[in-house]
């Protein structure tokens, strides 16, 4: 299994998951031309992607999916609520599912789980490679972590986890109180502190890659988020590679497989665009 974060942040999110000849995209929050550019940077064509899963209807996750699906003949999956919240998904005949459903997509089995966010029916995903059993969890856009997540996201090989803001920077930042409340609220975005608390519960010795995602450019910094996470997991068994995804760069590949329990940092790319 290989995972690339094509970009992550308030201006656009997209994550490519590949295993056994199957390629799927989790979100397509960039215009189709930008998606093509980012895919091209890692030698992937849009036509080689079989399907896309939209986690929720907010623009930074869905912006390019309709045009990309038409251009590259993707099958698009989204929760029933997400389709209702973004009617253009109906125009491309997006296939609905209920949060909690498992999608069987070629060599990948993708479990969906409802997230606490202010979308209509938002989801996170766990993709499992049929051949190797490798598991990748992609969790962003959530204001808090439900207790059930510890079970859902255990024994992962790759974890892409939101670490959106530093709480002090959010309070001191440029946003009005209403926006601060939305971002920091129970249905907003996960702070560095809350991300660390969750990671401390679910990381383990076999987790090869921990990737921090959806970092705010105004209320966070990669070095702050990484330091906070390192402190949070310092006394756990985690011995994998920790990194921060970027809004402006393609990051990856993050790899896992039957015998891959330690990441090879030299194999990862950070391609500025």
What kind of feature is each model-predicted range?
Residues 1-42, 122-141, 158:
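Conserved beta-strand hairpin/beta-sheet module of binuclear metal-dependent hydrolase folds
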Residues 4-14, 55-65, 69-70, 83-87, ...:
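Structured catalytic core of nucleotide-sugar glycosyltransferases
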Residues 26-29, 49-57, 77-80, 137-141, ...:
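Active-site neighborhood of phospho(di)ester-bond hydrolases with catalytic His/Asp-centered motifs
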Residues 32-78, 157:
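Active-site metal-binding motif and surrounding structural segment of the metallo-beta-lactamase
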Residues 58-62, 83-85, 120, 144-147, ...:
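Active-site environment of divalent metal-dependent phosphoester hydrolases
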Residues 78-133:
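Metallo-beta-lactamase
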Residues 147-246:
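Cap/insert and terminal regions of metallo-dependent hydrolase folds
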Residues 256-273:
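Acidic, low-complexity intrinsically disordered tails
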């Amino acid at each position: 299994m290989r995972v690339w974060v094509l970009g992550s942040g308030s201006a656009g999110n997209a994550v490519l998951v590949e295993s056994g000849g199957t390629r799927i995209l989790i979100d397509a929050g960039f215009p189709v031309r930008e998606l093509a550019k980012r895919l091209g940077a890692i030698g992937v064509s849009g036509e080689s992607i079989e399907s896309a899963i939209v986690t929720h209807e907010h623009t930074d996750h869905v912006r390019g999916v309709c045009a990309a699906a038409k251009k590259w003949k993707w099958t698009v999956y989204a929760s029933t609520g997400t389709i209702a919240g973004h009617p253009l998904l109906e125009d491309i005949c997006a296939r609905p599912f209920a949060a909690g459903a498992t999608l069987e997509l070629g060599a990948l089995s993708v479990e969906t789980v409802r997230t606490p966010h202010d979308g209509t029916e938002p989801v996170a995903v766990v993709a499992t490679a049929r051949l190797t059993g490798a598991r990748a969890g992609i969790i962003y856009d959530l204001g808090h972590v439900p207790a059930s997540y510890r079970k859902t996201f255990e024994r992962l090989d790759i974890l892409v986890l939101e670490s959106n803001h530093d709480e002090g920077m959010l309070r001191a930042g440029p946003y009005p109180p209403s926006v601060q409340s939305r971002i920091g609220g129970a249905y907003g975005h996960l702070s560095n502190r809350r991300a660390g608390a969750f990671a401390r519960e679910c990381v383990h010795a076999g987790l090869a890659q921990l990737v921090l995602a959806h970092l705010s450019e105004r209320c966070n910094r990669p070095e702050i988020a990484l330091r906070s996470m390192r402190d949070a997991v310092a006394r756990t068994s985690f011995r994998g590679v920790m990194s921060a995804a970027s809004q402006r760069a393609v990051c990856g590949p993050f790899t896992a497989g039957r015998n891959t329990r330690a990441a090879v940092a030299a194999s990862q790319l950070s391609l500025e665009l």
